[in-house]
Amino acid sequence: MQQQALQAAAQAYSTNVLAKYPWIDQGFLVPDPVPEELTLPFRELAQKYNFSALLAVIAQFNWWTGDISTIPALYGIKGLGPGLLRSLFGEFILSANGDTRAIYDAAAGVLGDSVLLDSDVVEVKRDVKIDEKTTSGVTVLVKQPGGSHKLIRARKLIVAIPPTMENIASYDLTANESALFSKFSALGYWAGVATVHGLNTSLTNVGAQTPFNQPAIPGTNGFNSAGSPGDFLVAVGFQDTDYTEEDAKAVLVKNLATLAAVGAVPKDAAETVTFPYVSDHKPYCVRVSAEEIKGGFYSKLLALEGARNTYWAGATFSGHNSALVWSFNEGTVLPGLKKDLGL
């Protein structure tokens, strides 16, 4: 019965929503004027087109989205474009060896010493003379591990980090760029591996009294087996970026204590859990308000592509999905970059 409801909701969603916005997997290519329904709370759009049964699924597969019921519909739709919808009812494409880093490791192997890992960007200038032939290029000054500095000169720059004002404080921003990027806000997302000895099965956190069964926030989506005994993939969501690693760990410890009290995990799980691998992904889901979307924010943002020798990429411009990131790169960034370089 539940599967039938999901399939009916998926059909309604595909027919009434995705068919109208075929660009959804290619980036935030929002038309001007902006369709009003893209700025509605997502639950209202779901009610309008009878696909409410999908919202819990979208929240689960896009952890952490923010409150799936209240986020602007544009962001909810980005969480379930045609590509992911086909995979949900078909098959997912995975790395053959299970290592999602493989493509990046291979790229690093090709680039060799040109990859400056663990370096800090000190200063970025994007409309400067770099040599006798290139009167308008970019320079990037970076501080490397150990304290040494390196100056990079190039014709063009691709920026793939979340473009929050904090992240790009070292850039020579124009008034227009500052005005746009200062509109962004972000969620918090902390992930890692938790070792819980004696726990032998995955656990999913389902909100019994929350909209569309979302976990209470700050909270985790569960403990998912990492493939080795006692190791579980964990992720903690926050409403903003004002938290510490200890705050994230405390959420998981509290969850384990609650589970231990009802016998779902070993009784000492909260006291003995360790976190051998952790990673803080904030700022996560960098977004703007429905009012900004309505005012044509994404058309203005897209107009920055190629300006001042700079191309912008990454999840902020495409969505938190590797396939979407690469689709935007191939459809927008690379064609523009190659044209500018005369390739």
Name each model-derived stretch.
Residues 154-156, 164-330, 336-337:
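C-terminal segments that line or cap access tunnels to active or ligand-binding sites in enzymes
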Residues 337-343:
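Active-site-proximal substrate-binding core of FAD-dependent oxidoreductases
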Residues 1-19, 31-32:
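Dinucleotide-binding Rossmann-like beta1-alpha1 core, especially the glycine-rich loop
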Residues 18-132:
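Active-site/ligand-binding neighborhood in enzyme catalytic cores
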Residues 146-156:
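Core beta-strand elements of the Rossmann-like FAD/NAD(P) dinucleotide-binding domain
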Residues 118-120, 143, 313:
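Conserved beta-strand termini and adjacent loop/short-helix elements that scaffold enzyme active sites
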Residues 115-117, 159, 312:
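A structural signal for the hydrophobic beta-strands that form the central parallel beta-sheet
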Residues 122-127, 131-144, 158-161:
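Acidic, glycine-rich loop-and-beta core segments that form the ion-binding/anion-interacting portion
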